């Protein structure tokens, strides 16, 4: 694996902290939702770490009421604002706010001149057709370094998908000259932490 020792330590820290909070979410979220009103868009401030990322879909905040897909397929308005719908959403999308706005990378804090992309920047969209990898590193304005590592390992009709560090694949291929193209108005303002290994994904020949 193309990770440096410091990056491995960063990853271990992320996993330990987030794993603890994810376990706590099963206790905290059911209680926190008792303090929410129907028209609320967020959990009470003291519980904010346990809501999903504060992203907007169709002009509506997804923090506790779900994104557009959730509203379309599972709980259409206004049923998405019921206790049950919110509970299911938050237990499915645990500590998104923490992973995004506390430990995540704020796009405005990235030094565009520091971005380095190694490997195939399009690896995330090949549907597992070919094995490969991409690693993106950057330095924040405060000097801290962040990385995102994505790897696909194909075997037969299936493949293993690995994504570690921060979701920097969103800026794969970016540099000081084109960075603004990766930070449009409707783009996410924070890039989450990630530690995901899916060993059994079916190859999609369409590359999706």
Language-model segment annotations:
Residues 1-21, 69-83:
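Compositionally biased, charge-rich terminal segments
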Residues 133-208:
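Cytosol-/stroma-facing membrane-proximal "stalk/adaptor" domains immediately downstream
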Residues 18, 22, 39-40, 52-58, ...:
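Acidic-enriched, low-complexity/disordered segments with a strong bias for Aspartate over Glutamate
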């Amino acid at each position: 694996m193309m990770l440096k020792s410091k990056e491995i330590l960063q990853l271990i820290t992320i996993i330990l902290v987030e794993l603890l909070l994810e376990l706590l979410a099963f206790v905290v979220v059911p209680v926190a939702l008792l303090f929410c009103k129907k028209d609320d868009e967020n959990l009470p401030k003291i519980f904010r770490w346990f809501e999903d990322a504060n992203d907007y879909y169709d002009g509506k905040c997804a923090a506790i009421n779900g994104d557009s897909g959730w509203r379309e397929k599972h709980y259409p308005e206004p049923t998405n604002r019921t206790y049950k719908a919110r509970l299911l959403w938050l237990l499915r999308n645990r500590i998104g706010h923490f992973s995004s706005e506390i430990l995540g990378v704020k796009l405005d804090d990235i030094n565009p001149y520091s971005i380095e992309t190694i490997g195939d920047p399009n690896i995330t969209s090949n549907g597992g057709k070919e094995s490969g990898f991409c690693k993106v590193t950057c330095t924040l304005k405060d000097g801290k370094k962040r990385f995102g590592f994505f790897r696909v390992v194909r075997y037969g009709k299936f493949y293993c998908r690995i994504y570690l560090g921060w979701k920097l694949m969103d800026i794969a291929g970016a540099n000081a000259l084109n960075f603004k193209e990766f930070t449009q108005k409707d783009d996410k303002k924070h890039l989450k932490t990630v530690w995901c290994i899916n060993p059994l994904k079916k190859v999609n020949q369409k590359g999706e």
